[in-house]
Each structure stands twice: as structure tokens, then as C-alpha cells.
Amino acid sequence: MLVIGSGAKHLEGEIKEKAPITNVEIKKFPDGEKYVRILEKGDKAIVVQSTYKPQDEFLIEALLLGDALRENGYRKLKIVIPYMAYSRQDRVTKEGEPISIRAVLKMLGLYYDELYVMDIHNPKTLEFFPGRAENILPSKEIAEYFSDKLGEGIILAPDKGALERAKAIAEILGLEYSHFEKKRISPTEVQMTPVNIDVKGKNVLIVDDIISTGGTMIKATEILRKLGAEKVFVAATHGVFAEGAIERLSKAVDELAVTNTIPTPVSKISIVPEILNLL
């Protein structure tokens, strides 16, 4: 049984075409508190709930859905979180701070046996979840979307930390891959250079987990153009776009596409097949 939370309503139509969805009542009390009610009995359920804006509200709703399902006799619960809130707060940078993602994952572990997230910022943080936790990369979906557009192109990561993401897509498509090396040349300027790869005359796909301002991608694109790249495409799992970022990035590249973990005007790649694989 699939339960769709308010944070994943934008995925409901596509999911409903392929799988039955459990009837759930979700509303707000006049004071703003959430009310949830499970309208069907069962033994196992998968909750799909993204936690992007309003993060706290959708997290509380995920907990209430878990509690309601347990109260209604469900014994085995999984939760799929397309976008995991607080995932970038994964370390203490100033004394007195929490490790926010740890707090969130421990709370979810009170109700859910298994957790599946799409491309979490730091996969190592999933160790904070007490049950089974899995990080899912939408490599197949991104590869399929760009396959014909890229031709015999190259996959690049914007930095070494994102190299595994580029590698996964490149291996599906049978293409070369590499990453940009960043070198600070002054207090205000960072130099970016593709490592050990020739982009001249090639189509290039730059891929990352999250795009916010798009500044890194724009700079990388400018460098690739100077090096003679043919077309430059940019993709990411999560489009956490700052104001004006889509417009600026779309002007700089040949195509910008992100998945629909967060609904945006450029959410052209669906992660629903990955959700359905868990049924």
C-alpha cells in the first residue's frame, strides 16, 4: 500500500497511473496543527513524503502518518523521501550547534523500519537511521533523458566529491567521465579545470546533487565553452533554485534539467520509476 504525503502531492498523479494509493485524510486544524487519518486497514505500507518547504510541517506530517499507521495495525513501514530536509546540516561548524540530520533521522526511526532517500547530500549520515536506510541515485533516469542529446559526449562532476555521480551515469551510457579540479588563485577567485580530459568538439553533461544559485555551473560552462566544448547540458537531482537561478543558468547552458523531487519549471526527469521499484 502506498500513502502519499502532502509533500509528495506533485508525484501522486504519475504514481497513481501505475500503483494503487491508500486513502488518507490530511488537513489542518484552525490553529495550524496537522491532522492525519488512515482510511484503510493493512499490514504493510510505503509512505512517500518529500520534505522541501515547509520542511518542518512535512517532517511532522511524516511522523504523524507513521504513528497513525502503527495505531491502525500496520506492522511493516517504509518511507521514501525524495528530498530530505536538513541533510546539509550534517556536522557541527560552531560550538553549540546540533547535527540536524541526525535528529531528523532518529525521529523517523521511531516509526519507520526502512528509509529510502533520493541522492542525500552526505550518504554517510544515513547511519544515524536505526533501521535499514538506502540512498538512491537517479542515474538511470538522468542517463536516459540525456542519452540522445549527448551522443558520444562526456560526463563531468563539478568537483571530486560528485565524481561517483558522474561515473554512474557515464557507465550506463558507456561514456568518458571526469571532474573539475578547483584551485584558489586569490582570496576572491577560484580556478576550475577539467581533469585529464579533452572536451573540444564534445557535448558535455555536468551533473550534481543540488543546484541552488547555479554559480558553479555557470562558471564551469564558461570554462567548457573556452575549451571548445560543443553543447553543455546541466543536470541535478534536486533543484533548490535561488531566485533568478533558473533564468541565469538556462541562458548559460544548452539545456538545464533536474528531477521532480522538487517541482520546478525544469523538473523534466521523473523519479517515480525508482519509487515504484520499491513496491
From Swiss-Prot:
Note on cofactor: Binds 2 Mg(2+) ions per subunit.
Catalytic residues in the record: 182
Family matches, as Gene3D superfamilies: 3.40.50.2020
Residues bound to ATP: 31-33, 88-89
Pathway annotation from the record: Metabolic intermediate biosynthesis; 5-phospho-alpha-D-ribose 1-diphosphate biosynthesis; 5-phospho-alpha-D-ribose 1-diphosphate from D-ribose 5-phosphate (route I): step 1/1
Lineage: Archaea, Methanobacteriati, Methanobacteriota, Thermococci, Thermococcales
Keywords, comma-separated and alphabetical: ATP-binding, Cytoplasm, Kinase, Magnesium, Metal-binding, Nucleotide biosynthesis, Nucleotide-binding, Transferase
Name of the molecule in the record: Ribose-phosphate pyrophosphokinase
Positions annotated to bind Mg(2+) 2: 159
Organism from which the protein derives: Pyrococcus furiosus (strain ATCC 43587 / DSM 3638 / JCM 8422 / Vc1)
Cofactor: Mg(2+)
SUPFAM superfamilies: PRTase-like
GO molecular-function terms, A-Z: ATP binding; kinase activity; magnesium ion binding; ribose phosphate diphosphokinase activity
Transmembrane regions listed in the UniProt entry: none
Family according to the record: Belongs to the ribose-phosphate pyrophosphokinase family. Class III (archaeal) subfamily.
Compartmental location: Cytoplasm
Enzyme Commission number, as recorded: 2.7.6.1
BP term (GO), one: 5-phosphoribose 1-diphosphate biosynthetic process
